[in-house]
Amino acid sequence: MILVTTFQLFLIIFIVTYLSVNMIYLIRIYPVKEELVAYPYISVCVPARNEERDVKKCVESLLNQDYPNFEVIVVDDNSNDNTPKIVSSMAEQYSNLIFIAGAQLASGWTGKPYALHQAYQRSRGQYLLFTDADLTYQSHALKTAVHTMVCKDLDLLTLMPAVIFGSFWERVVQPVIFGFIASLTNFRKVNSESHQSAMGFGAFLFFKKEAYQKIGGHLSVANEVLEDIMIAKKAKLNGLSVLVADGKSLFSIRMYHSMREIWMGWRKNIFLAMKSSVFRASYYMAMVLCFLLTPYIVVMCNLWVGAESVWVGISLLGLALTLATGLGLCHELGLERKNVFLFPLGAILMVMIMISSMLQTLLLRRTEWRGRIYEQ
C-alpha cells in the first residue's frame, strides 16, 4: 500500500496542478451593455431534429435579443415530432424568423452539418451564428458576441454555455464529463495563433461570413460527427483568428434529461473525441478513475490494513485535494457542494459510456444518433 499511496498522491498533485494552471488561461466573456458603434447583420442558424421539447424556448430567447439587426433561420432536419409545426407557427408571427423544411439527408453528409449548410444558403448576414435548438439565450448575447468579435478582431468566436442540471443522473454524470472535456481543452494552446491545437463548441460558433466561406463552410466537414471541433481546426489551419471562451453569462443549455439520453448522447462521439484511439481512451479512463474514485479506495484500504498513520495521512491528503478540486468544479457549474460526493459514481458511468462508444465505433463501425446510423 505504500507504493500505491505514494503514486496516488503524486498523480493527484499532477492533475490538480494541470487543471489549476489550465483554468488561469480560460477567458470569460461578460455582458456588454453599452451601445455599439455599428450593428452588422447577423444570421442565427439553428438546426432542429425532434426538438419539440426545447425549440420554442430557444427561438423565443433568440427573438428577444436587444440587438436590432438579425434574422433567425431554423432548419427542420426531417423531424418526426411537432418541431416543424411549432417553428412554422412562430414564423408566421415574426418577420425575422425563417423556417426551412430541410431536404432529405444527402449522401456523404451527417445531419447537423447538412442542416446548417442549408441555413447558410439562405442567410444574408455579415456574421453567422451556428447554434443548437436546446439553448436559452440571455437578451444581451448577440450584442456581446459582436462586441467581442470586433474588439478582438476575430474570425471565429466559440463559447461554452452555462449548464443546467435537472435530474439526479444529470448531476452524477454530466459534471464529470464536462470537467473531462475542459481538461482536454488546453486553453492556452487553443487560443494561441502559433499553435495548431483547436477546439470548437457546436452550441456557439460565431463566424465572420467571409471567414466561414474561406474554409469551405460546413461542406468541408460534411461527414463529420464532431463537426464543431473539425471546423475550428480548419479555421486555425487556414490562419484565421479564433477565440475559445467561457460564455456562461450569455446562454445556457440542458443537454439531456435522463440517463438514457445521457448514455445515447455521449456514446455517439466521446470515443471519437479520443481520435478513435484505444490507447488514448484507456489512458484518460484510467486518469478519471484514479482521480475521482481510487482516492476513496486507497483511504479505506489504508484504514482496513491498519497502515501507519503517516500513510493514512498521505492518502487523506490525496482525497482532500480531489475533493477540493471537485468543489471547484461544483462552483464553476453552479452545483451544490454535496454534489462532489456523486463524482465517483459519475466517473464509473463515464468510463462505461466510453467503453460502449468504443465498442460501437470499433466493432459495429457505426455511430447512431436521433434515429440515424452513420457508418464509420
Where are these regions (language model features)?
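Acidic donor-binding/catalytic loop of UDP-sugar-dependent glycosyltransferases
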Residues: 82, 131-148
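N-terminal membrane-anchoring/stem segments of glycan-assembly enzymes
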Residues: 1-38, 175, 350
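Long helical/loop segments within the catalytic core of UDP-sugar-dependent glycosyltransferases
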Residues: 98-118, 144, 148-206, 210-214, ...
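Cell-envelope/extracellular polymer assembly enzymes that use nucleotide-activated donors
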Residues: 40-43, 71
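Membrane-embedded multi-pass helical conduit in multi-pass membrane proteins
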Residues: 283-364
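Acidic donor-binding segment of Leloir-type glycosyltransferases
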Residues: 59-105
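Short, well-formed alpha-helical segments that are part of the catalytic scaffolds
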Residues: 25-32, 51-64
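Catalytic donor/gating beta->alpha subdomain of glycosyltransferases that bind UDP-sugars
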Residues: 149, 156-181, 210-213, 218-281, ...
